[in-house]
């Protein structure tokens, strides 16, 4: 079964399931515990929420990661065994120098927040100007990244 994660949402599951999301300027924060075969994806839309009691914690990098870790530990994962992968953050719209590059800001915030909780980023597929679809296999933690006809495993 494939669990689809919508914008600003968080999805967690156990093997043999997989988790999928479609990304543009948003960033997927992907956490996986290889020993327990448990993983999750947060579909981060924006860098930071000033409200730590956010009702939609998956929407922001600073609230998504603690919530994702909490949900994974409830499924049996151990925080010290989690590895992180990141994907997305494309510059989807041509912008002038006065426009904020949301994709770039999402990348920076996601990396910062992953480091803050002491996790290592094992691999990433970030930036560019093309959207992508990612699929996390909970059997082995591999992430298939599809950009048009291009396929890549991170």
Swiss-Prot record:
InterPro entries listed in its UniProt record: CheD-like_sf, Chemorcpt_Glu_NH3ase_CheD, Cytotoxic_necrot_fac-like_cat
Gene3D superfamilies: 3.30.1330.200
Keywords per UniProt: Chemotaxis, Hydrolase
Enzyme class: hydrolase
Annotated catalysed reactions: L-glutaminyl-[protein] + H2O = L-glutamyl-[protein] + NH4(+)
A biological process term (GO) from this entry: chemotaxis
One term of GO molecular function: protein-glutamine glutaminase activity
Source taxon at top rank: Archaea
EC number from the UniProt entry: 3.5.1.44
Family as reported in the entry's similarity comment: Belongs to the CheD family.
Protein task: Probably deamidates glutamine residues to glutamate on methyl-accepting chemotaxis receptors (MCPs), playing an important role in chemotaxis.
Protein name: Probable chemoreceptor glutamine deamidase CheD
């Amino acid at each position: 079964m494939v669990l689809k994660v919508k914008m600003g949402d968080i999805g967690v599951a156990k093997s043999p399931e997989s988790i999928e999301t479609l990304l543009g300027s948003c960033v997927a924060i992907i956490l996986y515990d290889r020993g327990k075969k448990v993983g999750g994806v947060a579909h981060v839309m924006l860098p930071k929420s000033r409200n730590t009691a956010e009702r939609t914690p998956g929407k922001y990098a600073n609230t998504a990661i603690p919530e994702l870790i909490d949900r994974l530990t409830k499924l049996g994962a151990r925080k010290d065994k989690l590895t992180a992968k990141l994907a997305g953050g494309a510059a989807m719209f041509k912008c002038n120098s006065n426009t904020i590059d949301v994709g770039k800001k999402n990348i920076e915030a996601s990396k910062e927040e992953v480091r803050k909780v002491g996790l290592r980023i094992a691999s990433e597929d970030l930036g560019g100007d093309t959207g992508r679809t990612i699929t996390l296999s909970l059997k082995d933690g591999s992430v298939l990244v599809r950009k048009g006809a291009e396929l890549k495993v991170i």
